[in-house]
Amino acid sequence: MITKNNVRAANKNEKTIETTKLSKKSDWKLLLVNYQNKINSDAKIDVVQLKNGQAIDKRCYEELQQMMDDCRDEGLDPIICSSYRSYRKQKILYEQKIYDLLNEGYSQTKAKNEAATVVAIPGTSEHEIGLAVDIVDDNYQMLENEQENTPVQKWLMKNCWKYGFILRYPENKKKITGVIYEP
């Protein structure tokens, strides 16, 4: 956070820069979880169960439900295929991906590095805080780049912001996010 500071400009004129804090550090909507901002393995998340057995942080349930309803009102069939998962579940997924890559001939180091671009290291996934949902088209339920061409994904990419959601891992941003594109 920047507070009032006197800054000398190149022309030696004094200028005052004043900024305000954008949010409280505890603002759950702005919680960033990634490789630099890990969560504890024992984090307590208050989730609500969805009809299909998935779960999300209860604080974003209404917005998610409204987004899904509005998408369906357009004649589309969105499906939540992945949402909240515990640290333990994340660890299992990550270790399974490493195992799969080792069986493909990757070295231990390369397998771990490659796995981390596809499956988040435990403690670094927004799924572990219940704020991430993977939504697919009922007619194409694969979590692949081709998902971006489905009517559901096109609608979501155009409208998700209206409900407080974003495309978390955009195309061509792997160097910034550390994660491959996930439409």
What is each residue range found by the language model?
Residues 1-183:
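Extracytoplasmic cell-surface/polysaccharide-interacting catalytic and binding patches
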